[in-house]
Regions:
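Conserved core of the sugar-phosphate nucleotidyltransferase
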Residues: 122-201
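A C-terminal functional module that forms or caps the active site or interfaces directly
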Residues: 211-226
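Aromatic-glycine-rich donor-binding/catalytic loop that engages nucleotide-sugar donors
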Residues: 201-215
Length: 226
């Protein structure tokens, strides 16, 4: 929802640029700054931002070099998600991560955290994934703790895990009829907000071979995970 109190310039930006680059307050700095600050506080040192082929605006804020720009104590690099011939929009989140691994081969054998650029994840959540000893993990939020109405929850992804908290299924933007199928054994809803830890050697082939979702015509990260 876009506020009617926005200025003409703010309204234009809200409709034309990535949500991560919307400017906050009088600083003229993007919302993404806050996520990067939390990543820094959590102990991260290197960040790769996946941008589109027309992603010059990201470079205006975080450095013009393809690799190793300095932002506070972080090293910022970019991976470019190219659009395949015959399409007019990117191929989806699984493809975005796949292209990042192709452009930064070191990630194919490393562990790393993946998240959306337009969600503000807490220091605690980011740190939990950084220090997690499992090779793959994700933050599975409890819906009641998020204090979001169910209508908003339906815009995220609902999950089911087994008794050992291993992921069994995940559904993006479930319909009203699907929602009731995703209560856990205690009757609670669990929500994925797309913040994961992956190990390249284990996720790479699933990204590469991820099928195209027939409804969205994209390669979705939840599909690759499952």
């Amino acid at each position: 929802m876009i506020s009617k109190n926005l200025s003409e310039e703010e309204l234009k930006n809200a409709n034309t640029r990535s949500k991560a680059l919307l400017e906050f307050g009088n600083t003229k700095r993007p919302i993404l700054d806050f996520l990067l600050l939390n990543a820094e506080k959590a102990g991260y040192k290197k960040v790769v931002i996946v941008i589109g082929e027309q992603g010059a605006l990201f470079k205006e804020y975080y450095g013009n070099q393809l690799k190793d720009n300095n932002f506070r104590s972080l090293s910022i690099s970019y991976a470019i998600q190219y659009i395949p011939v015959g399409r007019d929009k990117p191929m989806g989140t699984a493809d975005a991560l796949f292209q990042a691994l192709e452009q930064y081969p070191i990630l194919k054998t490393a562990s790393f955290t993946v998240c959306n650029s337009d969600n503000l994840y807490s220091v605690k959540a980011l740190q939990a994934l950084l220090i997690c000893k499992d090779s793959n993990a994700f933050i599975n939020y409890e819906r009641d703790a998020l204090q979001f109405p169910m209508l908003k929850i339906q815009r995220f992804a609902l999950t089911l895990v087994d008794e050992n908290f291993h992921l069994e299924t995940i559904v993006e933007k479930p319909s009203k009829n699907e929602v009731s199928n995703y209560k856990d054994v205690k009757g609670r809803y669990r929500v994925s907000m797309n913040v994961f830890k992956f190990t390249g050697t284990e996720i790479y082939s699933f990204l590469k071979n991820c099928p195209i979702d027939p409804k969205r015509n994209e390669k979705e990260l939840p599909t690759a995970i499952l």
